[in-house]
From Swiss-Prot:
Enzyme Commission no: 2.7.11.1
Pfam family, one: PK_Tyr_Ser-Thr
Protein name: Kinase suppressor of Ras 1
Spans annotated as Mediates association with membranes: 1-172
PROSITE patterns: PROTEIN_KINASE_DOM, PROTEIN_KINASE_ST, ZF_DAG_PE_1, ZF_DAG_PE_2
Length: 923
């Protein structure tokens, strides 16, 4: 002891001798440290300014409901948090007395508030002298009072409280901020709309530093009723979750999809071997772990009780404690059960499919041919099946699990033979014949697609009675054997989009179950649900529980939940929802987790930036705007629409017409290539139609038209129009100027654009009716009678029968090379067409032959119910006589005779230049 005292005295004298030099060196080092910290904070501030600018653009100029936008916002917010934490760490590395005023100004409190989306009016009310450091030193009640005084809402207070707690955690650890560790649950809360408010924020919902048991804290907490925090943790943003030290300090790693691996299950059951040495951390003194919670092991039934290992007792000092884990908050006294109706991992059952336009759920690229899983409805390329996520049966009835013989179920998928337990969320009723097997007795040698090893089962609580007969009760009995103490209410099923809303129960009358949520890019589950334990009673304050807002919503993407919908065809499942433009839902109480509309995804595929289009000379002018020749990966036709693109109703109508164009693929219909959908440049881009319009072709005296050529042109038009009608598209503007003819090929253009004619800005007159003669003769009588000044064209009663009437006029033009009513005033034409008398006079005054007149009279029928369909018109065209030329008279027609009759039937003899002359009956 004396020797140690002498050595200490000698060291003290040595320090006094060199004290002056050390003090000077320390002063110089402190100044250099402050300078370096200030420089680092300045560089970080530049990055913060850039990130805030990008974040402001995403929040104000982009659709926040888009999944890609939300992902970018979360990424920028995480970057800003990391930069601000680094700024504060740089400032804290300098002693308080050596910091300059400029260094003390970092990090800026306004940047912190904008990161967590605090309203500008709240930021303006915050005092100038309030800093982030001062806010960190306040307790929770004082922070709440300060923010409330500035006008912050409960949601904003909850977000800032949660963020400050995470920042205190990072500062207390003294380590570098991890981007995905502390803020993932906050992002998930804010994304689902159920962020932690100051009223519900408790110690159980806050992240605890590594090494502390959240189970113990939840059990020892005396603030309010015991509860747990339920939040969705996206797999892409959260670390590998595991149980914390509450489970005898045994870590159970899980996959990103949230299910236990066979290796994790083995490590959970088997006592640990020699623990590994922990690196780069100080060893903790040996201590005995807390006894395992009996309530927790009810999550995994029929597992043997873990016994304490003697070798483990002696090597506790080498145990690894600092493992990032997902903390499970479990309420004491709450029975937990294994639920296998959701998250059941089975092998994909792919079948080949083809779509007009579809997005691969794996590579996010468009595809036409691919495969679709009959279990989880995953759609992807055949080559992408290797990278496809694990298959999940989601609310599928048992009848839909039967194997089909289309494609083997193991396409590019190795069969996992190991039986894996999974956690479920929702009760699913089974019939009496469907007896679910016990989870720990799964047959690993059975077929992966067999229903005996992959059928969802019904949950039931474990009996806690000491009766020996109850010990043999299977973990998943039928619903009839369910304990009467736990009453699971039926879920509120929303027919649209298969959403389940669960009422939020009171903490004093129910128990809560923690759910593991997995997030896939396109085929995702956002699971956040509660279960009831009793019928909804009245709470302590007199309010009924069913009057509380539904705050937790489950959304199953492309999953069918009800039995009546099990027989729905695949075509209905893949239909486009044009009425959902843009993505809209019926208003529900409480926040709802949205997914991007399927229509919005399709429109993104066909959107062409206007800057990529090379605009050429104008080639036409219509009532909707000018048509230009242009180039976009080749020669195209660009139709610029003169409409107010900033009007949301007009823009929605335009996108609906784009959807009509998108679903057309026919050789006689113009090829749609895309559309410019960003105002003010709205345009439809189609393939460039070579050749001439049918209007100019039939009026050219140099072209010869015989019966074979007119029949061929008419058949091509009927094929294209029949295809459009089969797709549910009404042309509304069929005329010879909208039909192109080139080398025997007919192409129909400008179909469906009448739907937006009422919103065109150019040439609009409210008190005038602008009509052109080349349009009147194509209109059906029911449309002409409805035309009045001030009534838009898109409000007229267009129908498929009206298209047939317009085809009759085109058929007349092919025969007579002119319009049926010419050289007449517009008023006279309106009366003759509207009354039907004008077309009758045309049919009686012109001799076009019996077969031609029959087609005209059928198409021009006054009653629209009497007009034939295009399929019947095709049969009528087939009955037209065939032209057999004589070698000696190549320029004239023949005289055909009826074989079955001795009477000579008059036929077409020859065409004049614009006039069709009838044949001589005497010949």
């Amino acid at each position: 002891m004396d020797r140690a005292a002498l050595r200490a005295a000698a060291m003290g004298e040595k320090k006094e001798g060199g004290g002056g030099g050390d003090a000077a060196a320390a002063e110089g080092g402190a100044g250099a440290a402050a300078s370096r910290a200030l420089q680092q904070c300045g560089q970080l501030q530049k990055l913060i300014d850039i990130s805030i600018g990008s974040l402001r653009g995403l929040r104000t100029k982009c659709a926040v409901s888009n999944d890609l936008t939300q992902q970018e916002i979360r990424t920028l917010e995480a970057k800003l948090v990391r930069y601000i934490c680094k700024q504060r760490q740089c400032k804290l590395s300098v002693a308080p007395g050596e910091r300059t005023p400029e260094l003390n100004s970092y990090p800026r409190f306004s940047d912190w508030l904008y990161t967590f989306n605090v309203r500008p009016e709240v930021v303006q009310e915050i005092p100038r002298d309030l800093t982030l450091d001062a806010l960190l030193e306040m307790n929770e009640a004082k922070v709440k009072e300060t923010l409330r005084r500035c006008g912050a809402s409960g949601d904003e207070c909850g977000r800032l409280q949660y963020a400050l707690t995470c920042l205190r955690k990072v500062t207390g650890l003294g380590g570098e901020h991890k981007e995905d560790s502390s803020w993932s649950s906050l992002d998930a809360r804010r994304e689902s709309g159920s962020g932690p408010s100051t009223d519900t924020l408790s110690a159980a919902s806050l992240p605890w530093p590594p090494g502390s048991s959240q189970l113990g804290r939840a059990g020892n907490s005396a603030q309010g009723p015991r509860s747990i925090s339920v939040s969705a943790l996206p797999a892409s943003d959260s670390p590998t979750p595991s149980f914390s030290e509450g489970l005898s300090d045994t870590c159970i790693p899980l996959h990103a999809s949230g299910r236990l691996t066979p290796r994790a299950l083995h490590s959970f059951i088997t006592p640990p071997t020699t623990p590994q040495l922990r690196r780069h951390t100080k060893l903790k003194p040996p201590r005995t772990p807390p006894p395992p919670s009996r309530k927790v092991f009810q999550l995994l039934p029929s597992f043997p009780t873990l016994t304490r290992s003697k070798s483990h007792e002696s090597q506790l000092g080498n145990r690894i404690d600092d493992v990032s884990s997902m903390r499970f908050d479990l309420s004491h006294g709450s029975p937990q059960m294994v639920r296998r109706d959701i998250g059941l991992s089975v092998t994909h059952r792919f079948s080949t499919k083809s779509w007009l336009s579809q997005v691969c759920h794996v590579c996010q690229k468009s595809m036409i041919f691919g495969v679709k899983c009959k279990h989880c409805r995953l759609k992807c390329h055949n080559k992408c099946t290797k990278e496809a996520p694990a298959c999940r049966i989601s609310f599928l009835p048992l009848t839909r699990l039967r194997r089909t013989e289309s494609v083997p179920s193991d396409i590019n998928n190795p069969v996992d033979r190991a039986a894996e337990p999974h956690f479920g969320t929702l009760p699913k009723a089974l019939t009496k014949k469907e007896h679910p097997p016990a989870m720990n007795h799964l047959d690993s040698s059975s077929n992966p697609s067999s229903t005996t090893s992959s059928t969802p089962s019904s949950p039931a609580p474990f009996p806690t009675s000491s009766n020996p007969s109850s010990a043999t009760t299977p973990p998943n009995p039928s619903p009839g054997q369910r304990d009467s103490r736990f009453n699971f209410p039926a879920a509120y099923f929303i027919h649209h989009r298969q959403q389940f809303i669960f009422p939020v129960p009171s903490a004093g009358h129910c128990w809560k179950c923690l759910l593991i949520a997995e997030s896939l890019k396109e085929n995702a589950f956002n699971i956040s649900a509660f279960a009831h334990a009793a019928p909804l009673p009245e709470a302590a304050d007199g309010t009924r529980l069913d009057d509380q807002p539904k705050a937790d919503v489950l959304e199953a993407h492309e999953a069918e939940a009800e039995e009546p919908e099990a027989g729905k065809s695949e075509a209905e499942d893949d239909e486009d929802e044009v009425d959902d433009l843009p993505s809209s839902r019926r208003p529900w109480r409480g926040p709802i987790s949205r997914k991007a509309s399927q229509t919005s995804v399709y429109l993104q595929e066909w959107d062409i930036p206007f800057e990529q289009v090379e605009l050429g000379e104008p080639i036409g002018q219509g009532r909707w705007g000018r048509v230009h020749r242009g180039r976009w990966h080749g020669e195209v036709a660009i139709r610029l629409l003169e409409m107010d693109g900033h009007n949301q109703d007009h823009l929605k109508l335009f996108k609906k017409e784009v959807m009509n164009y998108r679903q057309t693929r026919h050789e006689n219909v113009v090829l749609f290539m895309g559309a410019c959908m960003n105002p003010p440049h709205l345009a439809i881009i189609t393939s460039f139609c070579k050749g001439r319009t049918l209007h100019s072709f039939v009026r050219d005296p140099k072209t010869s038209l015989d019966i074979n050529k007119t029949r061929q042109i008419a058949q091509e038009i009927i094929k294209g129009m029949g295809y459009l009608h089969a797709k549910g598209i009404v042309h509304k503007d069929l005329k010879s100027k909208n039909v192109f003819y080139d080398n025997g090929k007919v192409v129909i253009t400008d179909f469906g654009l009448f739907g937006i004619s009422g919103v065109v800005r150019e040439g609009r007159r409210e008190n005038q009716l602008k009509l052109s003669h080349d349009w009147l003769c194509y209109l059906a009588p029911e449309i002409v009678r409805e035309m009045t000044p001030g009534k838009d064209e898109d409000q007229l009663p267009f129908s498929k029968a009206a298209d047939v009437y317009a085809f009759g006029t085109v058929w007349y033009e092919l025969q007579a090379r002119d319009w049926p009513l010419k050289n007449q005033a517009a008023e006279a034409s309106i009366w003759q067409i509207g009354s039907g008398e004008g077309m009758k006079r045309v049919l009686t005054s012109v001799s076009l032959g019996k077969e031609v007149s029959e087609i005209l009279s059928a198409c021009w029928a006054f009653d629209l119910q009497e007009r034939p369909s295009f399929s019947l018109l095709m049969d009528m065209l087939e009955k037209l006589p065939k032209l057999n030329r004589r070698l000696s008279h190549p320029g004239h027609f023949w005289k055909s005779a009826d074989i079955n009759s001795s009477k000579v039937v008059p036929r077409f003899e020859r065409f004049g230049l614009g006039v069709l002359e009838s044949s001589n009956p005497k010949m």
